[in-house]
Amino acid sequence: MEYSIIHLSDLHRIKPENIECIMSSFEIEKARYAEMGLPPVQLIVVSGDIVDGSKEKDAFVAKQQIEQQYETATKFLSDLCKLFIGPKQEDRARVVIVPGNHDVSQYISERSMEQIEHDDNEIEKLADALWSDKEEGADIRWSWKTLHFNRIVDRKTYNKRFDDFISFYNTFFSGIRKFPKDPERQSYLIDIPDLNIALACFNSCYQLDHLRLSGYISPRSLSALTSDLIKAKNNGRLIVGVWHHHTRGLPNQSNYLDYTILDNMVQNGIFVALHGHQHISGMINEHKDVSSDAKLNLISAGTVYGNKRDIPPAISRQYNILVVDMNSEECSIELYSREDATALNEMPAWDRGTIGRSLKTSHKITIPITPHLVLEEEEKLQNDINQINLQIEKSGNLESGIDQLIALGMEKPLVRKFVLEMLQRTDNHIRMIQLFSDPQNIAEAMAIFESSIRNKDRSTLIKLMNLDIVKTTTDASIKSMVAEAKLVII
């Protein structure tokens, strides 16, 4: 099986009057793909920054500007889908979109914060909170523009800063999929059986706003996909991660991804991921799991229509073509960088581009594929769990549903995952402690820490802090919980 994927990122500055010229350039490209011997395009991936955003202080004007930008992006992406995939609404199922930092509506995040009035004695305390990973620092921000601390005072408003993006997303994919609203679980898996690929999509802008620029993927957004990722792996899928941020930056920068989540990505079978943000085409092996020799290959796309302000020196507009060649045991992915040969003219002239700062115009990697496993017992277990979940949703009786799940066997990871999720919807911290006092993974450790802290269960907290899974972790959330636990124990 062989097919091509178009990987775009950082649309930023496309205006209505630009669309005709851009689409003409892609019509020329489509004809050249055949000359280059590339297989047909079956997927379009857009890894964030659909719009440029607005810095207008007037919320009404800012919202109008952003909505106009999303209308333009919708027109461009619709035309691109028609050109390469098909003209029907259902053809948009082959388009994959995640948000970027420019998709955060600044006028909303500004409205959710207030400047903190403080005396000199409080500065050190506020600074410690700002740079700590404790819960108390989650709402503190620093503005270099005003040289003042700020605090999120309206979390409900703050959580609406992606509403403009979500409105665009849900309209574009009407009848196909919706973007998750829960900030801690903004992830979804797009499974495409006839291409034998599954795309694990994440919002890497968790807790990002106009004052906090660092990229971060909520661990809960990954844990929410665990069962889907296991199923995709057992079905022999190539699993591809998609998010916005790159993972490396200069010492004076902070606008890149917190890399601590990458180990979890590899453990979940994600060995290749697509991103943008740095405005340059590239490929790196960012993270390795020493125990299994597995590695995560990160592929970045440049900005498809930025201007001189957006583009690094000696680089022009760029996008990627990925050629996927798959058999039952392995998959090769060849990256072709395409670059605008003009001086940023209104109509790009695409040609061979470079990958990173090298002179290479293409590069191939090989990814192992898990053989398709026909696991009747596991499929039956999943069906049983689905039935119990349906009963819970109908009856609202969580405790009864939890009992039924436990009866399926707590030694089974899938059962444990769903029991944990159901218990987190209750306030039954005692039962949480009883069932998960020996956590098997980070998600369980987080939950048992939280319940033990709320219950002031010192003996369980001491036991947790001495577990290898806690002592050896680099997970910032666990470290934060350990710090809180120490305060309870004292």
Locate each region found by the language model.
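Active-site-proximal segments of metal-dependent phosphoesterases and phosphodiesterases across multiple
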Residues: 206-272, 278, 283
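A short C-terminal boundary segment appended to hydrolase-like catalytic domains
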Residues: 323-413
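N-terminal active-site segment of His-dependent metallophosphoesterases
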Residues: 1-95, 105-106, 227-230, 234
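Alpha-helical repeat scaffolds
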Residues: 398-408, 429-441, 461-473
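Active-site environment of divalent metal-dependent phosphoester hydrolases
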Residues: 14-16, 51-55, 97, 101-108, ...
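Extended active-site neighborhood of metal-dependent phosphoesterases/phosphodiesterases
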Residues: 71-220
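Conserved beta-sheet core of the metallophosphoesterase superfamily
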Residues: 194, 251-328
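Active-site neighborhood of phospho(di)ester-bond hydrolases with catalytic His/Asp-centered motifs
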Residues: 7-9, 42-49, 94-101, 239-244, ...
